[in-house]
Amino acid sequence: SFGYGLFTGALGLHYGLEKIGATVVPASSGNTQKQVMLLKDFGVTALVSTPSYALYMSEVAKEMGVSNDELKLRLGLFGSEGCTPEMRMQVEKGFGLFATDNYGMSELMGPGVSGECEHRCGLHINEDHFLAEVIDAQTGDVLREGESGELVVTTLTKEGIPMLRYRTKDITRLHYEPCACGRTFARMEKTTGRTDDMLKIRGVNVFPSQIESVLISLENIGPHYQLIVRREGYMDTL
């Protein structure tokens, strides 16, 4: 359900999925009712989209009277936006699938920089193509394993516009111990925010993803929100 246009997500995944023998249904974006029917009629087993659109699709499916028993969905590969654990649980419940996260950037290659395995204990970085570091956003110093900072990526095999220590502005941590799945690639945690959208309220670092985690856990509250910071006297209020 990624848009087939200048956005790198759809075409980037399309040919990779065909390479491993999958049949791709290029639904693109929009016309949600039609997409629900495609899921049902074609017996789709894996959904690729943003997590928020998957959540919306599950709501539309229920409105159409299409139950999870009529679908064959088993896996959801989501990306292009942050996905909190609470939103992931809602998507899994809504469609009855197993959700994984994928990280990528248009500047690097689109999707496929890193992705979760079945254990979901971090996103495995494809280190045969990318060298990842985490730095202090202010000083540029490389941080140790497990320390939070800005993700910096160097492309190792990209021929068109290679990137050397590209500053993503995404905040994460790196871990190097082997995963239970057997892969030995370094793993990055889900990004908690960006260096350019972090809010500091009365000396406290506030990330929009933290606010979303609380909102998603509340009934009758959607995943869409706006944060407004006001100055009252000499103090900021959120």
Model-derived features: where do they sit?
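Short hydrophobic alpha-helical segments of the AMP-binding
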Residues: 17
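Conserved coil-to-alpha-helix start sites within the AMP-binding
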Residues: 3-14
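Active-site glycine/GP-rich loop and adjacent strand/helix microenvironment
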Residues: 8, 20-238
